[in-house]
Curated annotation (Swiss-Prot):
Keywords linked to the UniProt accession: Hydrolase
InterPro entries, sorted: Isochorismatase-like_dom, Isochorismatase-like_hydrls, Isochorismatase-like_sf, RutB
Job of this protein: Hydrolyzes ureidoacrylate to form aminoacrylate and carbamate. The carbamate hydrolyzes spontaneously, thereby releasing one of the nitrogen atoms of the pyrimidine ring as ammonia and one of its carbon atoms as CO2.
Protein name from the UniProt record: Ureidoacrylate amidohydrolase RutB
Gene Ontology biological process terms from the UniProt entry: nitrogen utilization; uracil catabolic process
Record-linked HAMAP family: RutB
Family: Belongs to the isochorismatase family. RutB subfamily.
Organism: Pantoea ananatis (strain LMG 20103)
Record lineage: Bacteria, Pseudomonadati, Pseudomonadota, Gammaproteobacteria, Enterobacterales
Catalytic-site annotation from UniProt: D44, K153, C186
The protein's enzyme class: hydrolase
EC number: 3.5.1.110
Amino acid sequence: MMNIVENQTVVRRAPDNAGEERVLAARPEAIGFTPQQTALIVVDMQNAYASQGGYLDLAGFDVSATAPVIANIKVAIAAARAAGIKVIFFQNGWDNQYVEAGGRARPTSINPMRLKTMRKRPELMGKLLAKGDWDYDLVDELQPQPGDIVLPKPRYSGFFNTQLDSLLRSYGIHHLVFTGIATNVCVESTLRDGFFLEYFGVVLEDATHQAGPEFAQKAAIYNIETFFGWVSSVSHFCDAVGYKTEQNAA
């Protein structure tokens, strides 16, 4: 449940942007942004992470509560597009031989649950998180449109070995609004790396879902709002950009 304090201090990148500024209610304080300098980041909304029969489900994680998250992300995407905010989708995975995943003498080949799952169930090799397979595909409800950007990523962070930073700088973007799965893994990893690169990161709490128990979501949200960024909600995001839904019009 969001607990946003009204009439709070507003964090601004530069005072001279006030003419175009929108203000997003958030924790620990409201944050000002301009749509042209903001991107909505949709992290790994693939069947692997959000659907029954996908990688997380097969690995023993509960994905039964992802439907409302998908619906909320769909609203956030519509609001972003209507406001002229760039929408960037990430897809995590590799080729079906996992050559792009790298060699075996590395921690990222030993520790990740996805590779452990495939070692336990070799029949899944070439299917889990493999480009061109259903598991890698974005869920049907969240499909890119012309003008959106789709970036593959080989690791948890969307900044590592991708075009993200150079694309954001070329568009003059410095505010990032995060949605997706998993809050405590790829969402938090990308937001943290963005913070280190001087991006303002906001996570829409009700448009994310954790991998693991509920405390993993709470811990990730605590880390973000305390150390690395801001936390808001889809309804507050819609309010900030002037996008009307049945919920926020009531």
